[in-house]
UniProtKB/Swiss-Prot annotation:
The gene is tsaD. GO terms for molecular function: iron ion binding; N(6)-L-threonylcarbamoyladenine synthase activity. One of its GO terms (biological process) is tRNA threonylcarbamoyladenosine modification. It comes from the Bacteria. It comes from Kosmotoga olearia (strain ATCC BAA-1733 / DSM 21960 / TBF 19.5.1). This is tRNA N6-adenosine threonylcarbamoyltransferase.
Length: 330
């Protein structure tokens, strides 16, 4: 079974093809350089750029897989969450192809796609496992009990971790997107300052990063002589410490010995280093997607679509975008 999937939930336009769960091609066009001057994604511009790029990427994905459009058995696209204008570009194309070629259509939850990015490298990964989903818009700890059964056991009460990186990057005068910029600065810094870790009570697996952001703001006002690199390193350590302390504690509480990392922040090198150190201490198996599949891509969407399609689970052609789709929906 060949599945062609489209991802257009935010500012990356992507198309990928999998055959029986194996990746044949994956292409992507990023808009990061376009949105950088605005300090964030401009929805209207993002949707317009998706329209400009999507057909070229469709042809390129087919060419790289040495396939024609008639060779595709199932078409899929991200349904949400995301920017509604952006989502509609991918959904409209996938549904149009489905109608014109009389092939099934599958709508995919973008967040579950991030989890499934791990199956690209670890196809034999078995349930149950714990998930730390950490990105620009979401920070959650989930118990994955089966391919379509996700139980949320912790979430952010305010800012997502990736959002905190972006906001602190602006405070530090760094560029966009904030995550890579803060990480780069932190490599040349020393985490000599101590920023707060919120919600530390035992058994609480929720996160909070707004207070951390505010703490950095006031620290910079009161300590203008502080090196940006040191502040970046200290902030990064605070975020990573909070993420990993709660995630490994949740694994112990629920008796799970496998932790899967997902989302754009999972590309952070320091997060990976610390996670590996703790995992060795606690004898827990951890899984990270390849760096290129941590951020938005269509390969992860195709993997979810394949799992649904092989079970005969398809979506109605009048499926619409759901900008605030929850991960507990599939």
């Amino acid at each position: 079974m060949r599945v062609l999937a489209i991802e257009s939930s935010c500012d990356e336009t992507a198309v990928a093809i999998v055959e029986d769960g194996k990746l044949l091609s994956s292409v992507l066009s990023s808009q990061v350089n376009i949105h950088r001057k605005y300090g964030g994604v401009v929805p209207e511009i993002a949707a317009r750029k998706h329209l400009e790029n999507i057909l070229f990427l469709l042809d390129e994905a087919l060419d790289r897989a040495s396939l024609k459009i008639d060779d595709i058995d199932v078409f899929a696209a991200t349904q949400g969450p995301g920017l509604v204008g952006s989502l509609l570009v991918g959904l409209s194309l996938a549904k149009g192809l489905s109608i014109s070629l009389n092939k099934p259509f599958v709508a995919v939850n973008h967040l579950i796609g991030h989890i499934y990015a791990n199956f690209l490298s670890f196809p034999d990964l078995e349930y149950p496992f714990l998930v730390l989903l950490v990105s620009g818009g979401h920070t959650e700890i989930l118990l994955a009990e089966d391919w379509n059964n996700f139980k949320r056991i912790g979430k952010t009460r305010d800012d997502a971790a990736g959002e905190a990186f972006d906001k602190v990057a602006r405070l530090l005068g760094l560029g966009y997107p904030g995550g890579p910029e803060v990480e780069l600065a932190a490599r040349n810094g020393n985490p000599i300052y101590r920023f707060p870790r919120a919600l530390n009570e035992k058994g609480n697996f929720d996160f909070s990063f707004s207070g951390l952001k505010t703490s950095v703001l006031y620290f910079l006002k009161n300590n203008p002589e502080a090196r940006i690199e040191d502040v970046a390193a200290a902030f990064q350590e605070a975020v990573i410490d909070s993420l990993l302390t709660k995630t490994f504690a949740a694994a112990k509480t629920y008796g799970i010995n496998k932790i899967v990392f997902a989302g754009g922040v999972a590309a952070n090198t320091r997060l990976r280093e610390r996670a590996n150190e703790i995992a060795k201490e606690k004898d827990i198996n951890i899984y990270f997607p390849p760096i290129e599949f941590c951020t938005d891509n269509a390969a992860m969407i195709a993997m979810v679509a394949y799992e649904k399609a092989k079970r005969g689970i398809f979506s109605p052609i009048d499926t619409n975008a759901i900008p605030y789709l929850s991960i507990v929906s599939l």
